[in-house]
């Protein structure tokens, strides 16, 4: 599983980064900046296309990295987003979808009632109106 951190036009959908690293949002940033910030947090990152797929020729399972030198050499100019290799990064993401008639938010409320960890976990809104919960 991967998490996609979208480019500048969708920073509002990634408030964890916006609040933690970009203050009031006045700082301009690139995908490389975002990738390096995520790598600094210990996440293994790699560039993706507009369709959230690894760039052509990218063997993401092997090449995802948190090493600044390696991340800096990835082909960010051709990318449309930053992805995180969740398995390598030790990250679990709950994806509460609402598109196509899915009831993800209803199920999320049930999980929040049962588990404090889910209630307190960092989260972001997705472009389709759902939520990603980071555990």
What label would you give each PLM region?
Residues 2-135:
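Conserved phosphate/metal-binding and DNA-contacting active-site motifs used
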């Amino acid at each position: 599983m991967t998490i996609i951190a979208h480019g500048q036009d969708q920073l509002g959908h990634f408030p964890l980064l916006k609040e933690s690293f970009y203050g009031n949002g006045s700082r301009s940033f690139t995908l490389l900046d975002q990738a390096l910030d995520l790598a600094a947090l210990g996440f293994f990152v790699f560039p993706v296309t507009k369709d959230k797929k690894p760039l052509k020729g990218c063997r993401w399972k092997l090449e995802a990295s948190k090493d600044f030198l390696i991340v800096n050499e990835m082909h960010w100019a051709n990318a449309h987003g930053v992805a995180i290799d969740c398995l390598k990064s030790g990250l679990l993401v709950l994806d509460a979808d609402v598109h196509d008639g899915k009831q993800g938010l209803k199920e999320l409320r049930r999980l929040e009632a049962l588990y404090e960890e889910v209630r307190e976990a960092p989260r972001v809104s997705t472009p389709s109106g759902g939520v990603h919960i980071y555990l």
